Amino acid sequence: MIPFGGTEIQHRFLSHYVDDKLLDNFQICTSIPGKVELDKNKINILWQKNSYDQPNIYPWFEDKTNHDKYDWYIFNSHWNYEKYRYRFDIPTHKCHVIKNAVNNFPVLTPYKTGDMVRMLFHVTPWRGLNVLLGAMSLLQDCNVHVDIYSSCKIYGEDFEKQNEEKYEPLYEQARRLENVNYIGYKEHSFIQKFIYRYHMFAYPSTWEETSCNAALEAMAAGLYCIVTNYGALYE
């Protein structure tokens, strides 16, 4: 399995909605400088979706001789752009913000008084799953239920093998709670197909998001979103 997180979703949108002949004029590298070789015959773009403090990113930006290597730096939120501008003094005339997109706008199942409130959590476990489970343990007598689609598998089998075990205690905690249904990884298409069944997106994030596809998709589906204001989530 290849990784299919937010970056891959947005890259697929670009390939789907932009004409191939137009795209062929650009050499687009996502997030990690040098991951895709520069092409002197094309317009070179670094499409930055990762945080400024990542160890495979900030050393490159700290060396200002690198800043002219790309023609454009595209950021997925104003928060992310401002962090790079402030931290690395990047050339602002080469920077632009293009926010993440969604293309799924389902009709939400209406909530009726007395129905079970169905919540959704479909992000990686280090982004606040521990906080959500703590909250759910306090809601045992309420008519509230959460389905948890959380796993390291979204970033590929190698990443899963290296990291999944450390989150097993959280998954086990989820399995023990009666108002929590731990499902684990499901493909993005599955979540998009069935998101209309939920009423709320519960995301007590402890992670500085540079953007959040999961929140955007939940909002587009009409879910009530409970999120923190960490990183770019307020946008």
Where are these regions (language model features)?
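N-terminal pre-catalytic "stem/leader" segment of glycosyltransferase-like enzymes
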Residues: 1-33, 38
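Active-site proximal beta-strand in glycosyltransferases
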Residues: 27-56, 67, 71-75, 96-98
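Nucleotide-activated donor-binding/catalytic signature segment of Leloir-type glycosyltransferases, i.e.
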Residues: 160-186
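Short alpha-helical segment that forms part of, or immediately flanks, the ligand-binding pocket
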Residues: 192, 215-220, 234-235
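Short alpha-helical donor nucleotide-sugar binding micro-motif in glycosyltransferases
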Residues: 192-198
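Short hydrophobic beta-strand element within catalytic cores of glycosyltransferases
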Residues: 224-227
